[in-house]
Amino acid sequence: MVKNNRYLVLELAQHAINAVRGDRLVAQAASDAHFEPPLHVVAIGKAAAAMAAGVQRVLHKQIRRTLIITKRGHNSPWSKALRQAEIIQAGHPIPTRESLAAGERLLQWMEDAEQDARFLFLISGGASSLVEAPV
């Protein structure tokens, strides 16, 4: 009986984790979306790579460029799906010099876009530490 209860709890936990995966949620939300090109995707946060992979899966024909800013080590499971993306790893939970560099790069990246560019921002937890741009 105890083993069955343990198995049930583990199965429920795995189901809950799968239900909130960033790639799945973003792919589902974006599946009916259409953006006029050129579309530029910016994903920031600890789930940035997962979210970018999800939107890439359903909007790949519309996406011109993707910039991902995430916590160091949080992009590796998604690296294969995001070969074309620019990935920046920065400081979390405390901002670092990398966070300042990420902020500078984000501003430059946006300035480099076409006049008629559309931007899709995907933001998850950790973004306020990962990207800093002092005024």
Each PLM stretch: what is its role?
Residues 1-135:
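Non-transmembrane, aqueous-exposed alpha-helical and coiled segments at domain scale
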